[in-house]
Amino acid sequence: MLHLKVQFLDDSQKIFVVDQKSSGKALFNLSCGHLNLAEKEYFGLEFCSHSGNNVWLELLKPITKQVKNPKEVVFKFMVKFFPVDPGHLREELTRYLFTLQIKKDLALGRLPCSDNCTALMVSHILQSELGDFHEETVRKHLVQTQYLPSQASLESKIMQFHQQHIGRSPAESDILLLDIARKLDMYGIRPQPASDGEGMQIHLAVAHMGVLVLRGNTKINTFNWAKIRKLSFKRKHFLIKLHANILVLCKDTLEFTMASRDACKAFWKTCVEYHAFFRLSEEPKSKPKTLLCSKGSSFRYSGRTQRQLLEYGKKGRLKSLPFERKQYPSQYHERQCRSSPDILSDVSKQVEDLRLTYGSSYYRNVNGVHASESMLDSRRRNSAVEVTFAAELEHSKPEAEATSLHPSQSSSSFTFIYADPVFNTDPEPIEFFEERSPLSSFQTTSKFADSHTSKASPARQLTYTDVPYIPCTSQKVDIMPPQVFFYVDKPPQVPRRSLIMAEENMRPDSYVDHSAIKPAKRSPRNMRIKSLQQDLQELQEAMARTSGRSNINVEPEEEDPHLDDAFAYNLQEQTPKRSQSQSDMKTIRFPFGSEFRPLGPCPALTRKTDLFACTFAEQEFPTVLIDQSSAERYVASESSDSESEIIKPDYYFLYGKGTKSPRARIRLSSGSLQLEEEDETISFATPGAEDRTLLKPCNYFLA
């Protein structure tokens, strides 16, 4: 087996393994397959022969017969045939490779032209490689990369032209560069030193039109293919036989002397391939060998001709395959990429934190999925996306706000926003809002009520909240107060209801001496106690109607050893309220148990703090009564999520398993937050999450 090294036009190298007896076509096909190149006939593999001449690898000849030490030779993948019009190139990858070849020719000084033309071509290369103009980036890149032999004197012109290319894609820059290069005299020219019959030093070259004679960089004669009758070589003499012209008395055979026989033979082979590729309609067939010794070389061109390539491309048989352009580190300056490393590093660092945090046994929201802890976001840095997002939200606040937004302390951190928890005391569910409201929580609707009359209620702005589950303490209470997160604008005001009286009212054998309360003094405390008693009666009636029992006694859970940890959370930074004018907030209401979840493990863009420690810090018994007037209950059944039976709008279930419902996810798409729903649920909860009774007080969604 042979291990052969190939160097491509972007200076990358790859080693291919071929058989010992493989021909050059095997290595060439492997190289083109590595690039996913369809129009491969324009290219070839060049190497330095043992005589020191650069020659093309023959496709029909074994590699070992062309190269003495194949393992020590580097084959260069280069453009072999330059079409007269680069517009004939169908594929973007082909044009990109031609651009890389033009770039190499400019660096080697093979494309002499005026300073303006040279600077313009380099500016197109910079636009393709670096993108839009940025002075500091372009200046540093020109210092590190040599595009021209004398580049320092043209840097100002290059940068001046580069400023005019803002908004052009790399593919457009490639087309413009090739259009300029094709008009140059030395486009696609590989001159070979020679001398004429009089001993004058000249250069010979071959192009799509025929054989050229040059003196320096100036063409002094052109022999078109139509005029040439035969091309041959004898030792180091190259012979051109022309068609006889009766009108003009001239020689029909021209002889040129080249440096060596190998150089002369290599140039002759190149002329044969150029003539076949540009002039023939199909690949020439091999000549049958005679029994007797035949005179002359049997070399021929192998591959599709240009006409076949064009016809093949017109029929749409060439498949465009994706490719990757060479990237330069200098094209990403600080302003463009400072957020990307931050986000990626946060994702990798927080995967374990997410698993540990969501694996806790006592911190769970109403859907059985663990809510995020404050420690998760405390170690996370704010990326540039969040900085921009916070700044935009600060300037896009709605005109009518229920509360005032406190200014943030820094541009890179979010401010947290609070609102008062409002307990709905209406005994009937409220009407469904006809108009769309921004970022509203799950709202009730009379359309799904079971023959219940509904009263018109003034529309109030609803905000999204998350209600994690917290186990009860040793106090004999029915319902524990959830840990509430509010995305509104001011610190919460603790409701001044007597929690001790609430506890007494929840007990069936409790007795409250109302005679001790003076009826003449109507204090707010007495009014709240009376309202509390009414709420308790309504709660018992509603629970009796739904469960079919007159008395409901919920046994208290065992004392949780982690209860102290639940009260030990500290307030984090404040998060901004989303503006009503944002285009991505298009949902009227959130589905039951909806929450923001990203498409994969990624840093959260919002932070939440717990209101539990702030609200009940001074209370001895952390209990509160929850109004059940406007709630919706989903009955757990064996059917799918979409077939869950709705008993009453906005009613929560007390027994059994809660049904799963679609959750809202965040998809980062162009700096905006798009909410979409999906049916599948991704839970980081412990295995016992589904077996626990979940409480969902709906009135905590109202603010």
Swiss-Prot record:
CDD domains recorded: FERM_B-lobe, FERM_C_FARP1-like, FERM_F1_FRMD7
InterPro entries, sorted: Band_41_domain, FA, FARP1/FARP2/FRMD7_FERM_C, FERM/acyl-CoA-bd_prot_sf, FERM_2, FERM_central, FERM_CS, FERM_domain
Coiled coil residues, start to end: 525-552
Superkingdom to which the source organism belongs: Eukaryota
Major localization listed first in the record, in broad terms: other
Keyword Coiled coil: yes
Signal peptide extent: none
Pfam family, one: FA
GO BP: negative regulation of stress fiber assembly; nervous system development; positive regulation of lamellipodium assembly; positive regulation of small GTPase mediated signal transduction; regulation of neuron projection development
GO cellular component: cytoskeleton; cytosol; growth cone; neuron projection; neuronal cell body; nucleoplasm; plasma membrane
Induction (UniProt): Up-regulated during retinoic acid-induced differentiation of neuroblastoma cells.
Protein location: Cell projection, Neuron projection; Cell projection, Growth cone
Assigned keywords, A-Z: Cell projection, Coiled coil, Neurogenesis
Domain (FERM) ranges: 2-282
Tissue: In the developing cerebral cortex, strong expression is observed in the ventricular and intermediate zones at 13 and 17 dpc. At 17 dpc and P0, expression appears to be restricted to the cortical plate. In neonates, highly expressed in cortex, hippocampus, cerebellum, olfactory bulb and eye with little or no expression in liver, kidney, skeletal muscle or heart muscle (at protein level).
Stated role: Plays a role in neurite development, may be through the activation of the GTPase RAC1. Plays a role in the control of eye movement and gaze stability.
Protein name: FERM domain-containing protein 7
Source organism of this protein record: Mus musculus (Mouse)
